[in-house]
């Protein structure tokens, strides 16, 4: 089984790693900066003492021990307050002329050896766990100041104080970084827990969601922007889920109602036939009545299977150019006898050719026209208007409603939907005609909608020409 790391742990580790990396880099920069600072400080200090000693050489002679002693006293006075400072003056034969250093100090080897090979550069040496920095310079003297024309001045200093300070600072930073590991992990965990609180709320809501609590929603306003969008989409998902569940509940209720009537009729007629012996004509009438109910059940089953295939994209369309005006005129002629009985008329205007399955489109428009005639008042006109657009053909079917116009016209296309409890729309059918019509139009890549214009209802069909 694959080991999974929680998001809280991941973010905590990432937070800790970033925080520690930044602090360790800061510590490294601090140490490097201090080292550079002490390095420059020592260089300036040694250079200053070197120049001071050079000035003394220009003003003093050292032909005898008295001169050398006087020079040593001047240089020694300049060393007051500078513990760890070493000054050496040698001739070119590496013979010592002056050598001054603090009491109880170990003379560094850099003063004992000839340093003429490295001039005017600060060098660093380590002896007996002590680090020394030194600068040597060759200085010209006048002939009367000695036998040699040049001498070598070497100035060195003990960096023990700096080294001790840096060691203490490094030790402190080391232990601080160790403690920072635990602090970073804790702060990372705490910050992540606070930041992921909206996600835990989403998880809690999802785990507590049941069919009886589909109306629960999250509040995106209380979440950060990065999560509020996700929470809003989460709420949208619940809206779709609630809508789908409501449709499923309505569908289950409606299909039970639709099946109950024919099944009850079949049972009553069968019980009536079995109640006593009857002649052949009575049995024939009962069988014909049962046959009508069975046909109704068969049509309902076929319609349900058609809708199921449509929803799963299994409808096979035999597409070719379809003259909508011709098809609608044929339907007009087909429905005219039914419309004439109540003084209703049907008109078709416009033209348009689309790519589609003529049988499927004929069925879709037949359902729309049938509903328009069935639910319009007597002596009214059902108008069909075709209008060509840039890449499509729009078909508008307008008729006057005989009753109250449904409040939510879009739900007319739902399965078994009734506009009100009195089953205003499609009362004689199974309530699947408009659902089938919508499925056919969508299968052709078109759109179907309904809108109210006063007492009239307009069904708009949009079909692509190609």
Curated annotation (Swiss-Prot):
GO molecular function: ATP binding; phosphorelay sensor kinase activity
UniProt protein name: Probable sensor protein PcoS
Domain HAMP: 193-246
EC number per UniProt: 2.7.13.3
Matching SUPFAM superfamilies: ATPase domain of HSP90 chaperone/DNA topoisomerase II/histidine kinase, Homodimeric domain of signal transducing histidine kinase
Membrane topology according to the record: Multi-pass membrane protein
Class of the enzyme per the UniProt entry, highest EC level: transferase
Intervals, Cytoplasmic compartment: 1-10, 193-466
Protein task: Probable member of a two-component regulatory system PcoS/PcoR. May activate PcoR by phosphorylation.
Cellular localization per UniProt: Cell inner membrane
Main location: membrane
A Pfam family assignment: HisKA
Keywords: ATP-binding, Cell inner membrane, Cell membrane, Copper, Kinase, Membrane, Nucleotide-binding, Phosphoprotein, Plasmid, Transferase, Transmembrane, Transmembrane helix, Two-component regulatory system
Modified residues annotated as Phosphohistidine in this record: 257
Periplasmic side, ranges: 32-171
One GO cellular component term: plasma membrane
PROSITE patterns given in the database record: HAMP (PS50885), HIS_KIN (PS50109)
Catalytic activity, reaction form: ATP + protein L-histidine = ADP + protein N-phospho-L-histidine
PANTHER family xref list: SENSOR HISTIDINE KINASE CUSS, SENSOR HISTIDINE KINASE YKOH
Residues passing through the membrane, by range: 11-31, 172-192
Domain Histidine kinase residue range list: 254-466
């Amino acid at each position: 089984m694959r080991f999974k790391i929680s998001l809280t742990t991941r973010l905590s580790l990432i937070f800790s790693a970033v925080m520690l990396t930044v602090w360790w880099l800061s510590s490294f920069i601090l140490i490097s900066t201090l080292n550079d600072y002490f390095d420059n400080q020592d260089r300036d200090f040694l250079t200053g003492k070197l120049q001071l000693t050079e000035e003394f050489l220009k003003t003093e002679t050292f032909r005898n021990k008295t001169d050398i002693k006087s020079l040593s006293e001047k240089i020694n006075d300049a060393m007051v307050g500078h513990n760890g400072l070493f000054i050496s003056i040698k001739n070119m034969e590496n013979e010592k002329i002056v050598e001054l250093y603090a009491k109880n100090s170990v003379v560094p080897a850099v003063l004992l050896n000839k340093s003429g090979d490295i001039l005017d550069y600060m060098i660093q040496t380590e002896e007996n766990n002590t680090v020394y920095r030194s600068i040597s310079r060759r200085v010209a003297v006048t002939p009367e100041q000695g036998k040699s024309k040049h001498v070598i001045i070497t100035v060195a200093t003990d960096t023990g104080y700096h080294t001790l300070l840096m060691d203490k600072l490094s030790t402190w930073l080391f232990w601080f970084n160790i403690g920072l590991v635990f602090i970073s992990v804790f702060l990372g965990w705490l910050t992540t827990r606070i930041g992921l609180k909206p996600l835990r709320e989403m998880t809690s809501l999802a785990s507590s969601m049941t069919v009886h609590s589909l109306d629960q929603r999250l509040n995106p306003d209380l979440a950060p922007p990065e999560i509020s969008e996700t929470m809003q989409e989460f709420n949208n998902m619940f809206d779709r889920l609630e809508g789908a569940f409501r449709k499923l509940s309505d569908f289950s209720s409606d299909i039970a109602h639709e099946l109950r009537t024919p099944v009850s009729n079949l049972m009553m007629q069968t019980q009536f036939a079995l109640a006593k012996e009857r002649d052949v004509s009575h049995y024939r009438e009962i069988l014909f009545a049962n046959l009508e109910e069975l046909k109704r059940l068969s049509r309902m089953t076929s319609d349900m299977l058609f809708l199921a295939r449509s929803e799963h994209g299994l409808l096979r369309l035999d597409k070719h150019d379809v003259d909508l005006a011709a098809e609608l005129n044929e339907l007009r002629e087909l429905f005219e006898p039914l419309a004439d009985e109540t003084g209703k008329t049907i008109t078709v205007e416009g033209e348009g050719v689309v790519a589609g399955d003529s049988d499927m489109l004929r069925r879709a428009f037949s359902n729309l026209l049938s509903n328009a005639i069935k639910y319009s008042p007597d002596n009214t006109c059902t108008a069909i208007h075709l209008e060509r657009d840039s890449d499509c053909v729009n078909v508008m079917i307008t008729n006057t409603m005989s009753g109250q116009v449904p409040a939510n016209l879009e739900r007319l296309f739902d399965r078994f939907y009734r506009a009100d409890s009195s089953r205003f729309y499609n009362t004689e059918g199974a309530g699947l005609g408009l659902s089938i019509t919508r499925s056919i139009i969508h299968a052709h890549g078109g759109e179907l909608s309904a809108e109210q214009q006063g007492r009239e209802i307009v069904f708009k069909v949009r079909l692509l020409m190609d």
